[in-house]
Curated annotation (Swiss-Prot):
Residues 1-32 form the signal peptide. The chain crosses the membrane at residues 56-76. This is Transmembrane protein 52. Residues 186-202 have a biased composition (Polar residues). Keywords: Membrane, Signal, Transmembrane, Transmembrane helix. Residues 145-209 are annotated as: Disordered. It is found in: Membrane. Pfam families: TMEM52. One of its GO terms (cellular component) is membrane. The gene is TMEM52. It comes from the Eukaryota.
Length: 209
């Protein structure tokens, strides 16, 4: 779109000089006619003959026609582009798609250590996070399944055993008899003693077999 105004500006500068182009060979012609007596048999300069100047006028005419054609084509193109810009509605620029880069982090990487140290400073181990839906019972909750895609390593064997011991002690305590049952006055059935070699048998009567 910027070529049209530049071409028009250049043509405006050349238009005052166009009428002077045919006058350039006139001084040479004047010098040829200054001799006065120039017969065809004599060796006259070729610039003095009008028959040798026809190709110069033809070249100048061709140049003028080319300039006029270029100016006309530039003006037509500029007008067409301007009309198309006015006819098209102003649409918002299209959004360019965003590229998402996924960076894998290893547990030994400095980025992972920085993130874990920042989280440990912000939330210490002894501090409980505020939950909007109340406190959670840690004994009733099942441990989350370990995923291979998590950046943190799985817990060691000792930690897993320590985590499983409180859950095993809970059901064992619930199965113990309550001390209130003995104080309620219930009678316990005597356990029969087993017969052994040291146990004394009752004396037999004389009529018994």
């Amino acid at each position: 779109m910027a070529r049209g105004p530049l071409a028009a500006r250049g043509l405006r500068l050349l238009l005052p000089l166009l009428p002077l182009l045919p006058l350039l060979p006139l001084p040479q012609v004047a010098l040829g006619f200054a001799d006065g007596s120039c017969d065809p048999s004599d060796q006259c300069p070729p610039q003095a003959r009008w028959s040798s100047l026809w190709h110069v006028g033809l070249i100048l005419l061709a140049v003028l026609l080319l300039l006029l054609c270029g100016v006309t084509a530039g003006c037509v193109r500029f007008c067409c582009l301007r009309k198309q810009a006015q006819a098209q509605p102003h649409l918002p620029p299209a959004r360019q798609p965003c590229d998402v880069a996924v960076i894998p982090m290893d547990s030994d990487s400095p980025v992972h250590s920085t993130v874990t140290s920042y989280s440990s400073v912000q939330y210490p181990l002894g501090m409980r996070l505020p939950l909007p839906f109340g406190e959670l019972d840690l004994d009733s909750m099942a441990p989350p399944a370990y995923s291979l895609y998590t950046p943190e390593p799985p817990p060691s064997y000792d930690e897993a055993v320590k985590m499983a011991k409180p859950r095993e002690e809970g059901p064992a305590l619930s199965q113990k008899p309550s001390p209130l049952l003995g104080a309620s006055g219930l009678e316990t059935t005597p356990v029969p003693q087993e017969s052994g070699p040291n146990t004394q048998l009752p004396p037999c009567s004389p009529g018994a077999p």
